[in-house]
Amino acid sequence: MLNIRQERIKEYVEKNNVATIRELQVLFPKVSLMTIHRDLDALESKGVLVKFRGGARSVRHTGDPEFDVRMRENNGGKRVIADKAMSLLQPHTSIFLDASTTNLILAKNLPDINLNIITTGPNIAIELCRLHNPVVTLCCGLINRKNLAVSGQNTLEMLEKMNIDMAFIGVSGCSVDAGFTCGTEADMLVKRLAIQKAHTSVVMCGSDKFNCLMPYTFAKLPDVDYVVTEGNVPDAFRGAAEKAGVKLL
């Protein structure tokens, strides 16, 4: 039999399909993190939900939980970043959108203007199909089910043939010393090449990513032109960006 708190967790997960640990901590502010994990373990043992790193999902939910969690993290901030990034767009140009969740939000809110859009995000390409004017190219390659991104040698060879005016790149971590970082070598290679190919590169960095470090660096500050964020920029990073000639939005 479930206790009252576990019943509320069950109802929350069934309603939202996915619950992050952070959301459950907000839902139960007086309950310890250890207790929340024990509740999730108990609910999983009863077949109510399935745990994953950072949260739990409904047994009926078939989507990728890690992608859902990333979409919900700092969602309001990502919309602010996407809006700022869109202010840089010029019609009749060629742009690259990597498979980041911020770029998915950008795609959902993109105006119907003449653009040549190249993307490594299948879900981004599908979202852009609602528009009539952009020409959309989805890069070929292997699909990573966790982040819904295509990558690999075929992706790189295709990107190498593309001419890109402006690249919009998401990050998983950002610091003065390490630069802009991500979680996999495959993503690093795609992001790095897109920045090299682009005339102008725009890195979209949530304020929660500053001073976070991921395994792979795909660019340093002098390699990019803009850093777009929604919150306060650490003084050390601001100073380094100004020294490198990088514009902060």
Residue ranges and their predicted role:
Residues 7-11:
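Pre-recognition alpha-helix immediately N-terminal to the DNA-recognition helix
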